[in-house]
Amino acid sequence: MTDVRLTDDQWTKIRDFLRQEPNAYIGKDEQACRRFVEAVKWMSRSGSQWRLLPAEYGNWNSVYKRFVRWCKAGVWERMLAHFATD
């Protein structure tokens, strides 16, 4: 599979968007949030089941629950719309 890590430039743009997004919590550990976004990217590229998420991205169930929260809050939809015009 191709590398799903974000470049520093990509992460900076995503992080700046998320800081303005009231329903997306980055937290004090920005690297953990970056790993979360990379985990979602890995899932979308691999088509795998959540339980097969590599451990380097964190606990699959925690990543899944956060993904679902962001889905329900519309974070992903707004992010995609934002970057579609970028």
Which residues are covered by each model-predicted region?
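Short alpha-helical elements
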Residues: 1-86
